Structure formats: structure tokens, C-alpha cells
């Protein structure tokens, strides 16, 4: 197994013993589940972004963890964590904030937290990562004007269609 960091080491992804990627969503799942077991997960909640895999929501439902969704960007994750008193949050990209230790993403801290969880549980990362199933996910960017974005964001029919699709996928 191993860890990979971006250029300034604020992001961390892991590779399990079979060479499978363990992304930020799975790392947050593994670590937040351990925090919940140890009664250190504040309000039993993890903060994630709209980019998170639907598998994270299913993991939360199955494990009694609440997920709060923010816009993409660590600043939005941190803002929600500070506002509501949560202590773990992050992005699929591996940008994870552990508010008990820092107010920014720290890839090395993510690696240490992952290793500590492995040691406490006595299990490999491969085994721990099985706690969450990643579902196929596609990102499609659609260009819209700022006015169009505002109109779509506030359109009740669009909101209802999104909620209906999320409900179907999460059940």
C-alpha cells in the first residue's frame, strides 16, 4: 500500500495492497467510521462536497453517520465545519480537513490518520475500504451564463428532478 500527495501535499490519495485507488471519499468513510466508534466524530457528521460519490451517502446511512453537503472547494467545507462544529470533512480529491488538528487540508495528516485507523482496527486498508462502495460517476460540464446558473439553481422543477434522482439512487 502507499500514499500519493499533490504538489503542496494538501491532498492525499491511497493505494491498497492490490493497487486499487482509495480516494478522498473512501478515506473520509474509513476514518469517520473509526471516529464514530471512538466517540470522537462530532455530531456524528462528516462534511463532503456535491462531487462526492453516491456511495458515500449509502455508507453514511448504513453506519449512522450524517453527511452535510457543500459546494466544491475546501473553503466551503471548512466554513461549514466551523459554523456547525464538525471535525472531519473533505473532497473526493483527497483534500481532507481534520479540524481537531488543523484548519486546512494536510495530506500527511490524512496519511497518518489512515495508518492510525489501520493499526487500531488491525486491518489492511483494502479491508477497511470495503466499508464503502464507489458507484460509477461521470462529470459533465455544461456552460451557462451566470444568469442561467442562477435561474437553474432556483427553478423548482429542476430542484425537484434532482431530489427525485438522488432519492432513487440513494435508496
Task: Describe each region flagged by the PLM.
Residues 1, 38-171:
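Phosphate-binding and adjacent anionic-ligand microenvironments
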Residues 1-15:
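N-terminal small/polar loop signature for handling phosphorylated ligands or for N-terminal nucleophile
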Residues 5-7, 21-26, 102-105:
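Short glycine/threonine-rich catalytic loop with a Thr-x-Gly-x-Asp
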Residues 6-8, 18, 51, 93:
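Anionic group-transfer/hydrolysis microenvironments
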Residues 13-17, 97-99:
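Short beta-strand-to-turn element immediately C-terminal to the catalytic PLP-Schiff-base lysine
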Residues 17-22, 148-151:
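Glycine-rich tight-turn/loop motif centered on a GG-T
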Residues 29-30:
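Extended, compositionally biased non-globular segments that define protein topology
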Residues 34:
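Short, flexible loop segments at boundaries between secondary-structure elements
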Amino acid at each position: 500500500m502507499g500514499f500519493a500527495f499533490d504538489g503542496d501535499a494538501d491532498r492525499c490519495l491511497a493505494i491498497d495492497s492490490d493497487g486499487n485507488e482509495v480516494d478522498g471519499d473512501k478515506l473520509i468513510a474509513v476514518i469517520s467510521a473509526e471516529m464514530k466508534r471512538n466517540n470522537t466524530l462530532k455530531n456524528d457528521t462528516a462534511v463532503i462536497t456535491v462531487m462526492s460519490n453516491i456511495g458515500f451517502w449509502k455508507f453514511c446511512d448504513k453506519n449512522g453517520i450524517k453527511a452535510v453537503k457543500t459546494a466544491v472547494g475546501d473553503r466551503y467545507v471548512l466554513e461549514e465545519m466551523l459554523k456547525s462544529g464538525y471535525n472531519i470533512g473533505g473532497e473526493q480529491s483527497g483534500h481532507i480537513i481534520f479540524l481537531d488538528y488543523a484548519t486546512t487540508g494536510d495530506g500527511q495528516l490524512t496519511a497518518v490518520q489512515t495508518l492510525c485507523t489501520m493499526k487500531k482496527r488491525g486491518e489492511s486498508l483494502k479491508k477497511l475500504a470495503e466499508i464503502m462502495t464507489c458507484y460509477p460517476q461521470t462529470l459533465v460540464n455544461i456552460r451557462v451564463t451566470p444568469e442561467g446558473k442562477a435561474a437553474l439553481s432556483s427553478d423548482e422543477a429542476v430542484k425537484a428532478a434532482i431530489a427525485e434522482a438522488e432519492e432513487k439512487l440513494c435508496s
